[in-house]
Amino acid sequence: MKKKRKYLFIDILMLIIMLGGACALLYPLVGDALNNFWNQQVINYYQEKSNAENREAIQQEEKRIKEENKKIAKMGVPGNDPFTKKKPENTTLEKDYYQKHTIAVIRIPKINVALPVFDQTDNLFLKRGAALLEGTSYPDGGKGIHTVITSHRGLKEARLFSDLPKLKKGNHFYLEYKNQTFAYKVDKIQTIEPTEVETLNIVEDKNYATLMTCTPYGVNSHRLLVRGTRIPFSEGMKKTLAKADRVHRNRSLAILIFSLLLMIGIGSIVFKRIKSLKVRKRS
């Protein structure tokens, strides 16, 4: 009897370890895939809203942005570091709240990133997507522009900017703003202290966009900056983005299907094992 109980305990322990291991393996993959689906809904809403605007509304918005960027250029000081400043965190989780604060879309095909860009840099938004660093330029096609887009790295439930270090000089990334798409070619990659904000200053005759996240991984004492200079958006780039969008969606869908099948398989094994244990216990 004692021997049977011992084997029963070992069997139950192995089943628990198997389930725990599967959950630990799948959690970051499934979490990221679900976050991607959620972000895609926010992006779709933003795109539909932008496409529905009439020409007069678009022209008024373009005028407002140019005036806002002129004010930002005169101030010449980017906002505080979003990863160290203490700011009250809104706990609202409704999707329409995020949709209301979405001002752009960042796409980085090289690392399979497509995220909504929010207008505030508090942790609520940074855990979901990317954000425009306060005090930096709105995306625009003119000169004297330096847009800074920031996001988290290393979250278990979402990759976000985790793969940003994989970008190299010459790679492209894109910002969708209203009904326009701006293309950027990476020309500078550097690591700075959180206080070295002068690196993000506007250069009078240039149009830059910088992607910012924490580094080193797990330590987060410094900031990784990947700067791109604006280049013309071509028809070939449009095709690249369409292909990257399909890959992005298919990858997330494949992860969810694989995870579901794996859990069904493990569940089947566990069910059969429990049934077998009950039979052994009766005998």
Predicted regions and their residues:
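Short, Lys/Arg-rich, polar N-terminal cytosolic tail immediately upstream
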Residues: 1-4
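Solvent-exposed, non-transmembrane regions of membrane-associated and secreted proteins
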Residues: 6-250
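C-terminal single-pass membrane-anchor helix
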Residues: 240-283
